[in-house]
Amino acid sequence: MNDKNRISEQYTATQGKIISYLVQGLTAGKQYFKSKYIAKDLGLSPKEVGTNMAILSGICDELDISRWSYSNSTTWRVLPRSA
């Protein structure tokens, strides 16, 4: 099964959008993401992003997501999980 099908079956549509966004960022060399910028880029509210990132930090097998900082919007550290 390819990654897109697995993501669409395992996560909500919003969570799938966020995961795809994070994977693209990781590919570009980023590992820190602010909720407000994710929200702006994906057309979501920062609260919606924060809620889903907190959920994903506990259930996402592909990415290691941790809350990193709270100053001027929550910053999340995202790393690929070891296989």
Model-derived features: where do they sit?
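C-terminal flanking helix
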Residues: 57-64
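Short amphipathic alpha-helical interaction segments
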Residues: 45-55
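Short, cationic-aromatic polyanion-contact patches
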Residues: 65-83
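Short alpha-helical segments that sit at the start of domains
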Residues: 1-20, 70
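Short helix-capping/hinge SLiMs at alpha-helix to coil transitions
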Residues: 24-30
